[in-house]
Amino acid sequence: MKCTIVGATGYAAIELIRLIELHPHLEIVSLISDSQTNQEMNDLYSFMNNKQFPVLTAFSLEQIEAVETDLLFLATPSGISTKYLKQLDDWKGTVIDLSGDLRLEKSLYEKWYPHESVDTVLQKKATYGLTEWKREQIKDSRLIANPGCYATAVLLGLLPLLEERVIDPSQIIIHASSGLSGAGKTLTEQTHHVRSSENVRLYKMNQHQHIPEIESIAEDITGQQITVSLATYLVPLNRGIMATMTLQPLVEKTEAEWRTWFIEKYKQESFIRVGQTDPEIKSAAGSNYCDISVYLDTRTGRLTVVSVLDNMQKGAAGQAIQNANVIGGYPETLGLTQQPFFI
């Protein structure tokens, strides 16, 4: 498939480029950046010097069609994707949007995001791209709302439990930490090295835009209404997310039984690994894996589920490629089998 990336100079786009270069059936034919028009990617990023990429151009539907694009990735920030989505509504190719602009219905979006919502009719055309749980719908979709990074980590840990009605849906407490790439490429005081190095910072307490995404998608998939408390932290890492979910189980199982239960639930999934060792971000960084660990506190009776993934891969570009594989009829793991960096 011939691919165009819009917002080609951002972190998620760079990861997309890296993954597409590893994919035997995906080819980059156009790179779009309204802010860096007419520049070369290898002038902006020295690690690309050994490759020849298309010159960056401004967004143009005519150009996208001229290079015979089959698959377009929107790697633009929320609020920016919306203006492109309007122009792409009648386009015949496939769009995978990595922003949050298609994930929520209008009233929720405008409550949690500081932007005007995309058209309701257009939003309803989109399929939520949590691959392991929406695979059949993704196959036939031409408009994908790629999930958020925190939402991916949390939903992969929660959905098996919610589907079986084995936890209290009103007692879900989540603490989630993200590497700095999750804050995007634009420099802020909070992501400045002096402020972020040797520091852990709480941000958007109970106000993160992935809260309604988690709640609405959980209800859509399982039919069960949930409420979550979410505390999010920036930690001095380049990439990675660890989400720790404290839950109240409604059935009695031992820790070993809960772990076996999760293994059974995800036994067919190539990118979900249920482990017996304590989780760490390094075990997933640089890969499309999500590692899940399960703990039971016999003193309080509470269940803790920990999900670890790479926010740039499984939480963004990797999941987008996974969805592209599903749409293209390719093996789901194609181009995504690289092991974690670890060191």
UniProtKB/Swiss-Prot annotation:
Keywords from the UniProt entry: Amino-acid biosynthesis, Arginine biosynthesis, Cytoplasm, NADP, Oxidoreductase
Gene Ontology molecular functions: N-acetyl-gamma-glutamyl-phosphate reductase activity; NAD binding; NADP+ binding
Listed pathway(s): Amino-acid biosynthesis; L-arginine biosynthesis; N(2)-acetyl-L-ornithine from L-glutamate: step 3/4
Localization: Cytoplasm
Catalytic activity, EC: 1.2.1.38
InterPro entries on file: AGPR_AS, AGPR_type-1, NAD(P)-bd_dom_sf, NAGSA_dehydrogenase, Semialdehyde_DH_NAD-bd
Catalytic residue list: C149
SMART domains, per database record: Semialdhyde_dh
Catalyzed chemical reaction(s): N-acetyl-L-glutamate 5-semialdehyde + phosphate + NADP(+) = N-acetyl-L-glutamyl 5-phosphate + NADPH + H(+)
Record GO cellular component, one term: cytoplasm
GO biological process, one term: L-arginine biosynthetic process
Entry function: Catalyzes the NADPH-dependent reduction of N-acetyl-5-glutamyl phosphate to yield N-acetyl-L-glutamate 5-semialdehyde.
PANTHER family: N-ACETYL-GAMMA-GLUTAMYL-PHOSPHATE REDUCTASE, CHLOROPLASTIC-RELATED, N-ACETYL-GAMMA-GLUTAMYL-PHOSPHATE REDUCTASE, CHLOROPLASTIC-RELATED-RELATED
NCBIfam families: argC
Family as reported in the entry's similarity comment: Belongs to the NAGSA dehydrogenase family. Type 1 subfamily.
Name assigned to this protein: N-acetyl-gamma-glutamyl-phosphate reductase
Organism placement in taxonomy: Bacteria, Bacillati, Bacillota, Bacilli, Bacillales
Gene name of the record: argC
